[in-house]
C-alpha cells in the first residue's frame, strides 16, 4: 500500500503539533490548532471553486489503541492534553471499544480517538486538477525538466 503522504490522506493536524505550538501564547496555540483543523475544509472549498474531482471524502480519522493497554494510556493522556489546550469533543472524542467496533472491527481493542479533521483524496487526480487550475491563471508548468542546481 501507499505511504501516508502518497495514500491520499488530507490531515488537519501535524505529527507533533503539540510540541510545535507549545512555545506560543495560549490564544496563538488555539489559533494554530484552528488553522490546522481547517485544512480539509479549505481544500474542499478550493476543489469546489475550481471544479476539481479528486474523490474528496471527509470521514475523519481514528487513532486506535489496538493491541496493548499502554496504547490506551498514551491516547487518553494525549486526549487529556488536547482538552487542556481548549479543544473539545467536537475536535477529538474518545470512542469506547464498542463504539470503535461500529466503525472498525479490531478484536480486543481498547478504544480510539476520533477526529473529524481528516479527509481522503485521490492524489493524482488532485495534482492534475490543481495543474489545470493554475494554468488557467496563467502559470506555466514544465514537466520532466532537468534540475541543474
Task: Outline where the language-model segments fall.
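Active-site cofactor/substrate anionic-group-binding motifs, chiefly glycine-
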Residues: 1-2
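Glycine-rich active-site loop/strand segments that organize a redox cofactor
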Residues: 5-35
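Extracytoplasmic/periplasmic beta-strand context in beta-sandwich domains
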Residues: 8, 60-62, 145
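Residues at the C-termini of beta-strands that transition into short coil/loop
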Residues: 14, 96, 145
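Rossmann-like flavin
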Residues: 23-133
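A conserved beta-strand/loop element that lines the FAD pocket in flavoprotein oxidoreductases
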Residues: 134-149
Amino acid at each position: 500500500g501507499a505511504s501516508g503522504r502518497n495514500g491520499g490522506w488530507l490531515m488537519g493536524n501535524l505529527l507533533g503539533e503539540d510540541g510545535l505550538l507549545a512555545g506560543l501564547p495560549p490564544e496563538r496555540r488555539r489559533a494554530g490548532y484552528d488553522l490546522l483543523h481547517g485544512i480539509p475544509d479549505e481544500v474542499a472549498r478550493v476543489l469546489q471553486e475550481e471544479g476539481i474531482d479528486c474523490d474528496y471524502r471527509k470521514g475523519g480519522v481514528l487513532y486506535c489503541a489496538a493491541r496493548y493497554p499502554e496504547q490506551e494510556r498514551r491516547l487518553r493522556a494525549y486526549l487529556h492534553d488536547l482538552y487542556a489546550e481548549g479543544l473539545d469533543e467536537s475536535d477529538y472524542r474518545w470512542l469506547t471499544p464498542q463504539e470503535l467496533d461500529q466503525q472498525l472491527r479490531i478484536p480486543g481493542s481498547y478504544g480510539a480517538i476520533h477526529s473529524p479533521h481528516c479527509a481522503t483524496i485521490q492524489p493524482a487526480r488532485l495534482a492534475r486538477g490543481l495543474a489545470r487550475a493554475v494554468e488557467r491563471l496563467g502559470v506555466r508548468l514544465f514537466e520532466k525538466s532537468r534540475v541543474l542546481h
